[in-house]
Design a protein with these regions (language model features):
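Domain-level signal for soluble alpha/beta catalytic cores
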Residues: 1-126
C-alpha cells in the first residue's frame, strides 16, 4: 500500500447486510451478509452490490466477514462452513476489485462475541 494512502480521507463501502436485504436477500437467522456467502444464489447479488458501492465512490470495499466468526456460525448451525465462507468472501471481493484495480479490499474483523442482540418485538410492541 502506498504510504500516502492515509494523507486524505477515504471512502469505504456501505452497510452490506442491510443493502443485501433491500435488494431481495432473504434473512437467515443472525447470519446477515454471511447468508449471501452461504447461499450460492446470492453470490452475484453480493458481487453486484460490491461493484455498485465502488461505482458510488467507495475506494475500499470490506469483505462480508463480519458475521462469519465461529460463535455466530455455531449459533446458526453452520459452524462447519467457517473456512468456506471466509474464503468465498475474499474471492467475491477480489472479483469486484478485478473490474476496478485501484480499489482496496479490507477484511471485516468482528468482535468475537455479540455486538448487539436483535429486538424480536414487532413495530407495534415497540
Amino acid at each position: 500500500m502506498n504510504i500516502n494512502f492515509f494523507e486524505k480521507t477515504r471512502v469505504i463501502d456501505g452497510g452490506m447486510g442491510q443493502e443485501l436485504l433491500a435488494r431481495g436477500m432473504e434473512p437467515n437467522g443472525t447470519l446477515w451478509s454471511a447468508n449471501a456467502l452461504l447461499n450460492d444464489k446470492y453470490h452475484k447479488l453480493l458481487l453486484d452490490t460490491h461493484i455498485d458501492f465502488i461505482k458510488a465512490g467507495a475506494e475500499v470495499i470490506v469483505t462480508t466477514t463480519f458475521t462469519t466468526r465461529k460463535t455466530r456460525l455455531k449459533d446458526n448451525g453452520v459452524e462447519d462452513k467457517f473456512e468456506y465462507l471466509n474464503k468465498k468472501a475474499g474471492e467475491i471481493s477480489q472479483q469486484a476489485k478485478s473490474h476496478f484495480p485501484n480499489v482496496l479490499i479490507a477484511g471485516g474483523l468482528p468482535p468475537q462475541f455479540l455486538t448487539y442482540e436483535a429486538d424480536p418485538r414487532s413495530e407495534e410492541e415497540i
